[in-house]
Swiss-Prot record:
This is 18.0 kDa class I heat shock protein. PROSITE patterns: SHSP. InterPro entries: A-crystallin/Hsp20_dom (IPR002068), HSP20-like_chaperone (IPR008978), Small_HSP (IPR031107). Forms oligomeric structures. Residues 45-159 form the sHSP domain. Gene3D superfamilies: 2.60.40.790. Coiled coil: none annotated. Belongs to the small heat shock protein (HSP20) family. GO terms for cellular component: cytoplasm. Its main location: cytoplasm. It is found in: Cytoplasm. It comes from the Eukaryota.
């Protein structure tokens, strides 16, 4: 039991320790901002969207790109081929969330964008690219063109 009262909330604290992480949070009971300084999971969701990772897997038949885009509609995603050999995957999300209580009213607006470009190899058939979205996972398949092996002609050596 400490003889020094805790001025920093109901948790036990050591006010004399300069390295103590138990500090007073003026926003602890305020509904708009959490103790970490961010405003709910709403903004974190958009930040995760903006940092979207895309996996590129090469199979014997095709190059397959997979992007995890939870909560995104296929209308919010673009898949394009630029300059014949650059695959571009992009998306944008704008979201609004409103909460009302008898003490406060909160409206949050959030938006996020992502853009990824991949230079495709020479064996990519950009005329046959297919894309599909299922359960928040975008799959882009770029088939491979069968590369013709150079014809080798034997030359008879005389002499």
């Amino acid at each position: 039991m400490s003889i020094i009262p805790s001025f920093f909330g109901s948790r036990r604290s050591n006010v004399l320790n300069p390295f103590s992480l138990d500090i007073w949070d003026p926003f602890q009971d305020y509904p708009l901002i959490t103790s970490s300084g961010t405003s709910s999971e709403f903004g974190k969701e958009t930040a995760a969207f903006a940092n979207t990772h895309i996996d590129w897997k090469e199979t014997p038949q095709a190059h397959v790109f997979k992007a995890d885009l939870p909560g995104l509609k296929k209308e919010e995603v673009k898949v394009e081929v630029e300059e014949g050999k650059v695959l571009q995957i992009s998306g944008e999300r704008n979201k609004e969330k409103e909460e009302k209580n008898n003490k406060w009213h909160r409206v949050e607006f959030s938006s996020g964008k992502f853009l990824r470009r991949f230079r495709l190899p020479e064996n990519a058939n950009v005329d046959e690219v297919k894309a599909g979205m299922e359960n928040g996972v975008l799959t882009v398949t770029v088939p491979k063109v069968e590369m013709k092996k150079p014809e080798v002609k034997s030359i008879h050596i005389s002499g």
